[in-house]
Structure formats: structure tokens, C-alpha cells
Amino acid sequence: MNVEIITIGDELLIGQVVDTNSAWMAKELNDCGFRVKQITSISDDRQHIINALTEAQGRADVILITGGLGPTRDDITKTTLCEYFKTELIQNKKVLKDIESMFKSFGSEMIETNWQQADVPSNCKVITNSKVTP
């Protein structure tokens, strides 16, 4: 089975952050018998995300996306994915509760963009992350 990994984030392209996610994913996938055919890095740009998904669909059986989900006002990844897959964002109550618990454990207040982290595509399966960072 052929896999493509798409990494999203301007910070990756300008060298501000080193992409260790795709390297880790590729190794784990390879260890499980999957073949990563391509790793594509793109900016936080609606059209770049759509183009990367369209192109990857022609090459890969499985497409994995990492990045582009930071709690920033300019994040467009989720809305672009919803547009591409013809669905909408909904607030996931379990995810929101987990986010609230995390902030409480760190003694921090949530801001508007943190609430938006609980918004997920209505047709997705949420995979929770127990290893959170402040």
C-alpha cells in the first residue's frame, strides 16, 4: 500500500521548525509494511492544500496530513479540508472537555482560538492525544 504524507506549515518552509513528524511517521509506516512514496511540504495556503490533496489522490492509496492545526487566527487547514471533502466543522464536546482539562491542569486560561481547537469535520473520527503540551 502506497502512502503519501503532507506536512502543512509556513514555519516548516522557512526553517523555523524542523519537520520531525514526517520522518517519524515514515519510519513507523515502513516498520508496519507500508511504503511512503512521497512527502510533500506546503504552506498554510488554501489553494496549496487543495492542490496537494488532489495530486496525492492520484499517487497514493493513503494520504496522511500533519501540521497546520495550531491555535492561531490564520489557521485555515480545517476549513480547507472541510471544503475539499464537502463537510462542515462541528464542535466536539469530548475534545472541548479534554482541552479545558488540559488548560486547567496547566493553570492557564483558554482564549478564543483554543476553543476552536475542538472544532472537527463532522464526518471525521477523532483520535485523541493523551500527550499534550502547554
Predicted segments with their positions:
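Short glycine-rich anion-binding loops that position phosphate/pyrophosphate groups of nucleotides
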Residues: 10-11, 68-71
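Proline/glycine-rich low-complexity loops and linkers
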Residues: 48, 76-134
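An anion/phosphate-binding loop that grips the pyrophosphate of nucleotide cofactors and donors
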Residues: 60
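Well-ordered alpha-helical segments embedded in enzymatic catalytic cores
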Residues: 24, 48-52
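Short beta->alpha junction loops
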Residues: 38-48
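Glycine-rich phosphate/diphosphate-binding loop of Rossmann-like nucleotide-binding domains
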Residues: 1-39
